[in-house]
Regions:
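C-terminal helical cap(s) of enzyme catalytic domains, especially alpha/beta-barrels
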Residues: 1-11, 123-142
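An alpha-helical appendage that flanks or caps ligand/catalytic pockets
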Residues: 1-109, 120
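Flexible loop residues that form catalytic
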Residues: 116
Length: 142
């Protein structure tokens, strides 16, 4: 990320309308009232991304309960941990602090939040209330 931003900034061609480069960072985010709840809600996306990165077939996203029951195979756990470490997962205060930290670290103008919280069994996967809650809690904490 830092290298890509540096290349963009170094190669930026100013124009009258845009004299300075503008940058943004996209971050996968899961926010819940507690850290433990956020960790549960991120599990379906972790499993989906591990499948994508290891060449497994992509299936419809699992519920939180399905992801917890299946877990991540031991051989893929380091990959899962490495990916999730770059995401923002936590309670509102933790998440807001991490978003601010990332914005400062990469010196970006904007942070684009991609809510990736999973759904519990019986909740429509395509309209995850936890994704809406992620945005609401993060906005309130910012």
């Amino acid at each position: 990320t830092a290298e890509a931003l540096a290349l963009y900034r170094e190669g930026y061609q100013p124009s009258p309308e845009h004299p300075e480069p503008r940058t943004f960072l996209t971050v996968n985010v899961v926010v819940a009232p507690t850290q433990a709840q956020a960790q549960r809600l991120v599990q379906p996306m972790v499993r989906t991304m591990v499948a994508l990165r290891t060449g497994q077939p992509l299936m419809p996203q699992e519920s939180v309960e399905e992801a917890e029951a299946r877990g991540v195979v031991a051989a893929h756990q380091p990959l899962a941990d490495e990916m999730a470490s770059r995401w923002v997962v936590g309670d509102p205060q933790q998440a807001a602090a991490r978003v601010r930290e990332l914005a400062a670290t990469f010196d970006v103008d904007e942070v684009m939040v991609s809510p990736v919280a999973g759904s519990f069994a019986g909740t429509p996967v395509r309209r995850s209330p936890a994704r809406e809650e992620t945005l609401r809690l993060l906005a309130d904490a910012m």
